[in-house]
């Protein structure tokens, strides 16, 4: 199915409330469970190997920060890009990308603020906290996307509740959680190395690509291969050094 048209993004006019209420409660719970599965993978892959070298309570607190703020940004991405641009075809790809950059800049600004707090910097905890913060943000973005994917009215060839959509959802969960975690930890490295503004611009662009790209995977799942390549390029570094991108 063609996602991007000449004048805008192709899709069906549909309000966010209608889209959500089309799927049963069980399917919505499954969608959020898949999103949280990405948190488990990221936690077991990195945080669980840092035992004794970081503040567990602080890491968990930043995970909650990520979940709460991530839902706000996920809803913004859903209504301003997926709903307004894709389903209602009111924006072209350039305008949609600009909006994704604005959302990405907002995310990066919040991450820079949270990881740059004096107490966090003093503890040298900006990197592990950034990892858990990103996991929470990615989980909520994933959950909203999967709720959309399970909706048969989405207009995608892969929408609806079946094994294919579940597999796509699982792939999105891994990419969104690990992708956001890598980007947030990269900002944490910038905070500790006094390069927070340089990493802010890079992370904003990266988040913009990730947001728009993962939305597009609802129609073009092969994009998962592109993002998976980037994620797993940095994954060995994260496993070897304990912190990603360090």
Descriptions of predicted regions:
Residues 3, 8-246:
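Hydrophobic alpha-helical segments at protein termini of multi-pass membrane proteins
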């Amino acid at each position: 199915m063609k996602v991007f048209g000449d004048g805008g993004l192709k899709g069906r006019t549909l309000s966010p409330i209608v889209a959500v209420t089309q799927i049963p409660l069980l399917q919505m719970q499954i969608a959020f469970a898949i999103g949280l599965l990405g948190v488990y993978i990221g936690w077991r892959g990195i945080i669980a190997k840092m035992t004794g070298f970081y503040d567990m309570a602080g890491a968990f607190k930043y995970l909650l920060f990520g979940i709460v703020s991530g839902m706000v940004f996920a809803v913004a991405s859903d209504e301003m890009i997926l709903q307004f641009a894709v389903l209602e075809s009111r924006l072209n790809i350039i305008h949609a990308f600009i909006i994704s950059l604005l959302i990405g800049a907002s995310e990066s600004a919040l991450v820079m603020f949270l990881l740059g707090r004096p107490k966090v910097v003093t503890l040298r905890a900006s990197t592990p906290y950034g990892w858990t913060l990103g996991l929470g943000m990615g989980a909520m973005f994933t959950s909203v996307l999967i709720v959309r994917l399970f909706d048969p009215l989405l207009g995608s060839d892969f929408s609806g509740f079946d094994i294919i959509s579940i597999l796509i959802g699982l792939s999105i969960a891994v990419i969104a959680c690990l992708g956001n975690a890598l980007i947030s930890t990269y900002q944490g490295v910038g905070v500790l190395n006094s390069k927070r503004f340089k990493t802010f611009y890079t992370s904003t662009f990266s988040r913009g690509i990730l947001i728009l790209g993962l939305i597009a995977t609802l129609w073009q799942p092969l994009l998962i291969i592109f993002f998976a390549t980037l994620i797993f390029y940095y994954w060995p570094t994260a496993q070897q050094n304990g912190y990603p991108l360090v």
